[in-house]
């Protein structure tokens, strides 16, 4: 058995300085002069911004032999797929484990986005499919399904993704999703489907 080590990229701020310090390139500085992410704060005095900091962390993980990096789906953080797509161009071998809720994307949208990412990155996307979290926060963000139903939906979601990936004309009818002839074609269909993983603490 091979053991792999994965780093974690901070999508909700990270800094050696106290919150609010002008030198905070780890971002999530809540002060009015805070960085926008791509552009450094004018009060810092240089052009090193939050996305540059994340690039350094990703490159350091790659140089030090990590197999990949986890990008968590923090409720108020940056979106993992967007950030990892930017960082894929800054690295050569590092895999990106992007956490997401199936309810945030349609199966077709997720399939097309993942295939595009795989083409751009050379097949370095890993999906961390999550269904859990705070019920209150999930409802606040538009998630209508209760705990058990989210797991059933996730199974259907992945059935559709695999079907779209393997067929140019895929048909499916489930409880939450239906497809009538969709599927990847051309170069997108030749991209490798992401490794899919999931973790949780549910006891039901």
Residue ranges and their predicted role:
Residues 74-76, 100-108, 131-135:
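Acidic, glycine-rich active-site loops and adjacent beta-strand->loop/helix elements
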Residues 61, 69, 96, 125-127:
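Hydrophobic residues within beta-strands of alpha/beta enzymes
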Residues 16-17, 37-45, 109-204:
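Internal, glycine-rich beta/alpha segment that forms the wall or movable "lid"
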Residues 1-91, 193-194:
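N-terminal beta1-alpha1-beta2 module of alpha/beta enzyme domains
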Residues 80-98, 153, 157, 164:
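Alpha-helix-loop-beta-strand connector modules within alpha/beta enzyme cores
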Residues 6-8, 72, 97-99, 128-130, ...:
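A cross-family glycoside hydrolase active-site/sugar-binding cleft signature
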Residues 80-81, 107-111:
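Conserved strand-to-helix beginnings and helix N-cap segments that scaffold or border functional pockets
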Residues 41-47, 70-71, 97-104, 144-148:
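The substrate-binding groove and active-site-proximal loops of carbohydrate-active enzymes
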């Amino acid at each position: 058995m091979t053991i792999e080590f994965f780093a974690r990229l901070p999508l909700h701020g990270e800094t050696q300085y106290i919150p609010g310090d002008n030198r905070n390139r780890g971002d999530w500085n809540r002060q009015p002069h805070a960085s926008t992410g791509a552009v450094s704060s004018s009060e810092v005095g240089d052009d090193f911004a939050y996305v540059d900091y994340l690039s350094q962390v990703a490159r350091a993980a790659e140089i030090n032999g990590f197999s990949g990096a986890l990008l968590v789906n923090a409720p108020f953080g940056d979106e993992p797929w967007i950030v990892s797509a930017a960082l894929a161009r800054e690295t050569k071998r590092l895999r990106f484990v992007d956490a997401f809720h199936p309810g945030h994307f349609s199966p077709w949208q997720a399939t097309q986005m993942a295939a595009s990412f795989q083409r751009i990155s050379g097949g370095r996307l890993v999906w961390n499919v999550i269904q859990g979290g705070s019920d209150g926060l999930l409802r606040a963000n538009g998630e209508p399904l209760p705990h058990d139903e989210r797991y059933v939906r996730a199974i259907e979601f992945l059935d559709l993704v695999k079907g779209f990936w393997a067929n140019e004309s895929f048909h499916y009818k489930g409880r939450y999703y239906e497809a009538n002839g969709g599927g990847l074609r051309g170069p997108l269909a030749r991209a490798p489907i992401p490794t899919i993983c999931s973790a949780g603490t549910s006891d039901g």
